[in-house]
């Protein structure tokens, strides 16, 4: 964690044009209209917004560019888009529709040159490498999974993260598949291993169940930002109260 202000980032997982949320990447339930949700989150002090088209990569569908454009027209906070980005042309199209950053997951792993070329053209500041990991007990290590968690790679997670950084990724969006949607808290050991080994910001994802979990991710896990979906989508906690909890624990946040 750097000395910068900690960021709270709601994530819109999009399927068939709707916001959805599941547990461990399955059992998806409808959580609302993405454009409406984006506007509400901005009003409620979100620092950034993340939009992930969760079926684009696996179904090989084109990114919902029209939806990206509508959300970008609605909000003024930084806006990251991922899902189905496979080429530099895809990166260009998403940025031209109003995204500030792009998030690449499966395609970056399968074609690491995509990170290299995209960062050379558009700058590392707008390239987020999304990494989905699961702890493999038999090998006692975290490993990379692709296609929304459906494809096992066998590659050690931090090894791939280091390569991604070397190729120009400006941030790592780190999701624990073991914790995703469980609301049992972030995987602190995973966060610490990444934040202590990498020089770029780490966005913690997977497991947020309450504001205290987010405080823990920043203070103990040394994450630079926390990303959450279900606890915000269904209204149990607001971003404002999450930030107040952070502030009470001495974390610098934006509250105006």
UniProtKB/Swiss-Prot annotation:
Functional pathway: Amino-acid biosynthesis; L-histidine biosynthesis; L-histidine from 5-phospho-alpha-D-ribose 1-diphosphate: step 5/9
Gene: hisF
GO terms classed as biological process: L-histidine biosynthetic process
Primary location: cytoplasm
Family: Belongs to the HisA/HisF family.
Database matches in PANTHER family: IMIDAZOLE GLYCEROL PHOSPHATE SYNTHASE HISHF (PTHR21235:SF2), IMIDAZOLE GLYCEROL PHOSPHATE SYNTHASE SUBUNIT HISF/H IGP SYNTHASE SUBUNIT HISF/H (PTHR21235)
The protein's assembly and partners: Heterodimer of HisH and HisF.
Cited function: IGPS catalyzes the conversion of PRFAR and glutamine to IGP, AICAR and glutamate. The HisF subunit catalyzes the cyclization activity that produces IGP and AICAR from PRFAR using the ammonia provided by the HisH subunit.
Assigned EC number: 4.3.2.10
InterPro entries hit by this protein: Aldolase_TIM, His_biosynth, HisF, IGPS_HisA/HisF, RibuloseP-bd_barrel
Domain of life according to the entry: Bacteria
Alphabetized GO MF terms: imidazoleglycerol-phosphate synthase activity; lyase activity
Keyword tags: Amino-acid biosynthesis, Cytoplasm, Histidine biosynthesis, Lyase
Listed name of the protein: Imidazole glycerol phosphate synthase subunit HisF
Catalytic activity, as annotated: 5-[(5-phospho-1-deoxy-D-ribulos-1-ylimino)methylamino]-1-(5-phospho-beta-D-ribosyl)imidazole-4-carboxamide + L-glutamine = D-erythro-1-(imidazol-4-yl)glycerol 3-phosphate + 5-amino-1-(5-phospho-beta-D-ribosyl)imidazole-4-carboxamide + L-glutamate + H(+)
Gene Ontology cellular-component annotations: cytoplasm
Locations listed in the record: Cytoplasm
Pfam families hit by this protein: His_biosynth
Gene3D superfamilies, sorted: Aldolase class I
């Amino acid at each position: 964690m750097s000395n910068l202000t900690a960021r709270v980032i709601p994530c819109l997982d999009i399927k068939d044009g709707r916001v959805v949320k599941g547990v461990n990447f399955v059992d998806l339930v409808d959580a609302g209209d993405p454009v409406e949700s984006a506007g509400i989150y901005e009003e409620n002090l979100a620092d950034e917004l993340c939009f992930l088209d969760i079926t684009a990569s696996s179904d090989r569908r084109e990114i919902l560019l029209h939806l990206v454009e509508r959300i970008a027209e609605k909000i003024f906070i930084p806006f990251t888009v991922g899902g189905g980005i496979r080429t530099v042309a895809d990166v260009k199209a998403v940025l031209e529709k109003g995204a500030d950053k792009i998030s690449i997951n499966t395609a970056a792993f399968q074609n690491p040159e995509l990170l290299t070329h995209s960062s050379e053209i558009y700058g590392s500041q707008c390239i987020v490498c999304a990494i989905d990991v699961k702890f493999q007990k038999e090998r006692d290590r975290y490993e990379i999974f692709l296609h929304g968690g459906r494809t096992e790679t066998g590659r050690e997670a931090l090894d791939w993260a280091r390569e991604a950084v070397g190729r120009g990724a400006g941030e790592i969006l780190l999701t624990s598949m073991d914790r995703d949607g469980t609301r049992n808290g972030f995987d602190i050991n995973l966060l610490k291993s990444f934040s202590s080994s990498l020089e770029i910001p780490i966005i913690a994802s997977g497991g947020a169940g309450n504001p205290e979990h987010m405080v823990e991710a920043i203070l103990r896990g040394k994450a630079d930002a926390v990303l959450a979906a279900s606890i915000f989508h269904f209204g149990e906690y607001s971003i404002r109260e999450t930030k107040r909890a952070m502030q009470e624990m001495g974390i610098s946040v934006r509250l105006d």
